Structure formats: C-alpha cells, structure tokens
C-alpha cells in the first residue's frame, strides 16, 4: 500500500451500500500485492467476525478472485477465536490451511492454542487443516521450547522461524512492507 492509509470494506460499505465496487475495496501494494482491509465495528458494538464475513462476501460478489487470479490468499485475523466469527474464513471455505504465527510470549501462545483448538473442533467437518506453526521471535525466555510444546500439543510442526528485527517495527510504522 506504499505507506498510504486504506479505507476498510466495512466503512466503504456503510457509505456506498450497493454501489461498492471491487476497485473501491482493493489497493495494489508493493510488487503487485493486492491489499484489502476488512475493518470491524466500533469497539464494544457489533460483531467483528460478522464484518470479516461481509468483507469476504463482497470480494466474492465483485469477482475479486476471478479478476486478480491470486496465487495465494492470506487472511490475517486476530488470535481471539473464542468468537466464532473469527473462524468464519475457514468454516465458509475461504481457507484450505491455517498457519499460526506466534511468539513465545504467554498471551501469544494462548492465542495460538485457541486458533489450533478452533481448527481441531472443525477437523471432522472438512474445513481447513492446521498447516503448522511459524515462530515469530520476540526473544523471550524459553521461546523455542514453548512454541515447540504448542506444536506438539496439537500434533503439528514448527514449519518456520522468523528472526526478531526492529526493521519490521520500523516498516510497520511507515505503513510499508519490510521489502520496501
């Protein structure tokens, strides 16, 4: 998105209702990556999970997948899948695999476990499978051990390890990718 702010699909929908077009919802980012920001309700009001589904439905209705023909689609959702709405991308057939990216911080491990439990709960229904865990290092004590234990608890593997770098935080502050 080249450091530009993105309007969320929910905000655009609330303004335009039926006149929402694909070009309104998408932004071409670095090296042709197509970006979409679903958005959410005012904190304390509404259902964020329902907002995610509405955004996914609008992308489908406007032919996003046929227009852009993406090689891969990534959904970056919160780890708080206690609300069933956050598991909707996998339950509605929008995801084949779930990859959990977590650090060894206790709350991150807890969120990762919640995601893994949600995937397990739907395992017999033919929804998305757990594809593994990626360690996003924060350099906390016993980090690798804790993430490995999480993987073992859910019969999966640690499939990648990201090194902690302040460059990631700097890029995020600028609204850019690390590669930019």
List the model feature ranges, each with a label.
Residues 10-13, 157-164:
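Beta-strand->loop->alpha-helix junctions that form or flank phosphate-binding loops
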Residues 39-50, 106:
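Flexible beta-alpha connector loops of hexameric P-loop NTPases
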Residues 54, 61-72, 77-161, 170:
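Conserved catalytic-core segment of NTP-binding enzymes
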Residues 1-38:
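N-terminal phosphate/diphosphate-binding loop that engages ATP/GTP or pyrophosphate donors
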Residues 172-180:
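C-terminal boundary of histidine-terminating zinc-finger modules
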Residues 34, 51-58:
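Membrane-embedded hairpin module used as a gating/binding unit in multi-pass transport
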Residues 43, 164-170:
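A short acidic, often aromatic-flanked loop/helix-cap motif at beta-alpha or helix-coil junctions
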Residues 16-20, 56-57, 80-81:
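Short gly/ser/thr-rich secondary-structure transition/capping motifs
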